[in-house]
């Protein structure tokens, strides 16, 4: 407390609850604290945990050391979508570590497995940029095996593109505009019948540099055409 009162909220046993919490904890929007242990847990590869301000600890995930990763030495972040994101130093498809997403209820998704070429053994926390991407570093890997700085696009963090009203131009084309996030890449697609699932790409992917992106399309002999925009991931 501010007057110097020290209280131990929880002591790890090094068993199913985990052990060696190298990183700190974060307080999420729900008021609880979340963190990782670098070792132990039910499967011996570290854990993600939740702890209340009263010291009640819940293990949200015990890493198995397979595709879910192992030995998370870094802390977590809570991104703007409300989910928690973190890294494991090892495990994953190539045993070079992972980036993972986990809900506050403990549902874990591996977003990427490092393979050495794109980096290896991340041991620091991620940062969510103002562009809604996640940024981080790896200790090893990359062309010279001295580590990399990486950016990871998580589609759920990027707002869904929203079209403005189209404008019919006098030369037989239609002007299209939609909301974008600068730095993200979008692909315009179309179909002539909404019953079809075969959406066709129109032109090359477009790298947005502002909050609104505009382009045009030739209507041609089509009596109707439907458009959509999808976010292109790396």
Q: What is each residue range found by the language model?
A:
Residues 154-234:
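Short, composition-biased motifs enriched in small/polar/acidic residues
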Residues 1-163, 168-173:
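Extracellular beta-propeller repeat domains
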């Amino acid at each position: 407390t501010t007057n110097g009162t020290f209280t131990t909220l929880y002591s790890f046993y090094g068993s199913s609850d985990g052990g060696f919490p190298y990183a700190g904890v974060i307080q999420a929007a729900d008021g609880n604290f979340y963190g990782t242990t670098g070792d132990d847990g039910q499967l011996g590869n570290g854990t993600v945990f939740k702890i209340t301000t009263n010291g009640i600890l819940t293990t949200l995930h015990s890493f198995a050391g397979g595709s879910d990763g192992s030995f998370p030495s870094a802390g977590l972040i809570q991104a703007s979508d409300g989910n928690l994101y973190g890294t494991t130093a090892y495990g994953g498809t190539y045993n070079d570590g992972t980036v993972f997403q986990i809900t506050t209820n403990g549902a874990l998704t591996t977003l990427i497995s490092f393979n050495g070429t794109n980096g290896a053994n991340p041991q620091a926390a991620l940062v969510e940029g103002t562009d809604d991407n996640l940024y981080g570093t790896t200790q090893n890997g990359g062309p010279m095996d001295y580590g990399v700085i990486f950016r990871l696009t998580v589609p759920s963090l990027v707002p869904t593109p929203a079209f403005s009203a189209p404008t019919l131009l006098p030369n037989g084309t239609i002007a299209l505009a939609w909301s974008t996030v600068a730095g993200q890449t979008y692909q315009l697609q179309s179909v002539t019948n909404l019953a079809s699932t075969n959406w066709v790409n129109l032109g090359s992917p477009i790298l947005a540099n502002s909050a609104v992106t505009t382009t045009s399309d030739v209507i041609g002999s089509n009596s109707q055409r439907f458009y959509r925009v999808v976010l292109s991931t790396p």
